[in-house]
């Protein structure tokens, strides 16, 4: 009888340790996705040298077209501003006052974006 209880206890402990290990691996791999994006005022909390997502509203009168497909603009969270440099095709919803998420790296005081995601507003309008 003692041997059966001991074997069952060992199996339970192995299952528990396996579950803990699996959950730890999942959380470790999801670490960079737990915070979807940083606002400009919290960008200093982000880990430097890694790819980041930063989000905010495109500040009015800040869009500066440098060349045919290179642009700079400023995003804000109404606390702090951050200059974004982007080279590529702009999303269709990109405009002043619109929310965006930029994916890239922080370089000095500028953010070099490799991808832009334009956020739409939360108001639903059915097609007419």
Swiss-Prot record:
The UniProt record gives the binding positions of heme as: 120, 124
Q: Which InterPro entries match?
A: CcmE (IPR004329), CcmE-like_sf (IPR036127), NA-bd_OB-fold (IPR012340)
Give the chief site where it resides: membrane
Chain ranges on the Periplasmic side, renumbered to this chain: 30-128
Residues passing through the membrane, by range: 9-29
Q: Which GO terms describe its cellular component?
A: plasma membrane
Establish whether keyword Repressor is in the entry. no
Question: Keywords in UniProt for this one?
Answer: Cell inner membrane, Cell membrane, Cytochrome c-type biogenesis, Heme, Iron, Membrane, Metal-binding, Signal-anchor, Transmembrane, Transmembrane helix
Functionally, this protein is described as follows:
Heme chaperone required for the biogenesis of c-type cytochromes. Transiently binds heme delivered by CcmC and transfers the heme to apo-cytochromes in a process facilitated by CcmF and CcmH.
NCBIfam families recorded:
PRK13254.1-1 (NF009727)
What protein am I looking at? Cytochrome c-type biogenesis protein CcmE
């Amino acid at each position: 009888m003692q041997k059966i209880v001991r074997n069952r206890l060992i199996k339970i402990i192995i299952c528990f340790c396996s579950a803990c290990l699996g959950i730890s691996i999942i959380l470790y791999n999801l670490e960079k996705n737990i915070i979807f994006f940083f606002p400009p005022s919290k960008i200093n909390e982000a880990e430097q040298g890694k790819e980041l997502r930063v989000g905010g509203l495109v500040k009015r009168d800040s869009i500066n077209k440098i060349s045919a497909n290179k642009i700079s603009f400023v995003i804000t969270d109404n606390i702090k501003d951050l200059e974004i440099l982007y080279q590529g095709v702009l999303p269709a919803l990109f405009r002043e006052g619109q929310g965006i998420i930029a994916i890239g790296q922080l370089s000095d005081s500028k953010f070099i974006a490799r991808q832009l995601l334009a956020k739409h507003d939360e108001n639903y309008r059915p097609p007419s």
